C-alpha cells in the first residue's frame, strides 16, 4: 500500500489501493497523504477505483522530499511527471487548497485527465482569464466558512468552466472535508459515478 518513486531526483511517497479507473488524491499545504485515509475517503474509493494518495513536495507533514517551485505551474508539471512515471492515464484528480490550484493549473496545461475535483482552491482569481480552457467535468467543493479562500470563488469557476458542479458545505471551514467528512464523501462518490 505504501510506495515511493523518484521524480526529478526527489523521493515521493504515496499510498495505493484498489482496482479500476485511477483517482488521484492531493492534500493541502498543512496535510499529507494520510489525510484522505483519516477521513475514510481513500478506503471508500478503493472499493471501486484504483486510488493513489501522494505526499506532495509542498506539504508540511509530507514525508516526501520537498522543493520550492518557482511557480505553481512547476508543481503542475511535477504532477504530470509523477503521473507519467507511474503510468497513470486519464486520472480523476482531487486536490485541496494549494493542490486545488495545482489541479486547475494541471487541467489548464492540457495534461491528461478525465475530470477534476477541487476543494477550496487558492488563487482562483488569477486563473480566471484562462479557466474557460478547462474542458473536463469539474466538481467544486467549498466550506461555507472558508477564511483562506472565499467560497465566492466558486462563482468564478462556475461561470468560466462549462461543465462545473458546485457544492458549499454548511458550517465548514477551509478543510471542509475534515469538518464534514460524511457529506463530502457522498458528494465525491456521486460525482465520480457521473464522471
Where are these regions (language model features)?
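A conserved short beta-strand
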Residues: 112-123
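The serine-hydrolase catalytic nucleophile loop
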Residues: 30-41
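Acidic catalytic loop of the alpha/beta-hydrolase fold
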Residues: 145-149
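Conserved alpha/beta-hydrolase
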Residues: 45-63
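Catalytic histidine-centered segment of alpha/beta-hydrolase-like enzymes
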Residues: 172-181
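Gly/Ala-rich beta-loop-alpha elbow adjacent to hydrolase catalytic centers
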Residues: 95-103
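Conserved acidic catalytic loop of the alpha/beta-hydrolase fold
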Residues: 74-90
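Short beta-strand/loop motif that positions the catalytic acidic residue
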Residues: 134, 140-142
